[in-house]
């Protein structure tokens, strides 16, 4: 099975990439796995008009500083995906896309992650798969035109 990684991070969204940044900075041997592409849920599980619900300046990931025209504006999810991809590239983060974790078990004090390409062993696993991919509407909004929601 090969080497034992210090950490495997599951999820290549903003949290997973931010964790990877710090792991790399501390020279921890790790990989980031995502079943899709970087920021996959931002690509496929957001409605067309979705914008981040915080000012752009608050969405800057570790090791970066804000660059852009409107620090207090709200960027689209498409712009955020581009930022995530650029961030991973600029910081040379070890992201493995199209790599779903099929099974996670403990074996001899290590975590065993089964993926389509093979099995990984790690001392630690971080699950960073997100929780903000569902639209929530109050019941009273049912009578509003869909373009307002």
Region spans (language model):
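Glycine-rich dinucleotide-binding loop and its adjacent helix/turn
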Residues: 76, 129-149
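Conserved Rossmann-like nucleotide-cofactor binding loop
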Residues: 15, 37-38, 132
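Glycine-rich FAD pyrophosphate-binding loop
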Residues: 8-10, 21-47
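A conserved short coil-to-beta-strand element within the FAD-binding core of flavoproteins
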Residues: 97-111
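Beta1/beta-strand and adjacent pyrophosphate-binding region of the FAD-binding site
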Residues: 2-15
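Glycine-rich active-site loop/strand segments that organize a redox cofactor
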Residues: 33, 43-81
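Short hydrophobic core segments
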Residues: 8-10, 101, 119-133
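Helical element adjacent to the flavin cofactor pocket in flavoenzyme catalytic cores
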Residues: 78-95, 101, 132-135
């Amino acid at each position: 099975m090969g080497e034992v990684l210090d950490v495997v991070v599951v999820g290549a969204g903003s949290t997973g990439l931010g964790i990877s940044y710090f792991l790399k900075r501390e020279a921890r041997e790790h990989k980031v796995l995502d079943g899709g592409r970087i920021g996959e849920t931002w690509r496929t599980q957001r409605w067309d008009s979705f914008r981040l619900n915080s000012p752009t300046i608050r969405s800057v990931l570790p090791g970066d500083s804000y660059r852009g025209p409107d620090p207090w504006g709200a960027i689209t999810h498409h712009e955020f995906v581009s930022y995530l991809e650029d961030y991973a590239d600029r910081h040379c983060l070890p992201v493995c896309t199209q790599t779903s974790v099929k099974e996670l078990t403990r074996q001899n004090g290590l975590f065993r992650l089964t993926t389509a390409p093979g099995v990984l062993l790690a001392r630690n696993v971080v699950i960073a798969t997100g929780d903000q991919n569902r639209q929530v509407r109050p019941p009273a909004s049912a009578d509003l035109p869909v373009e307002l929601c």
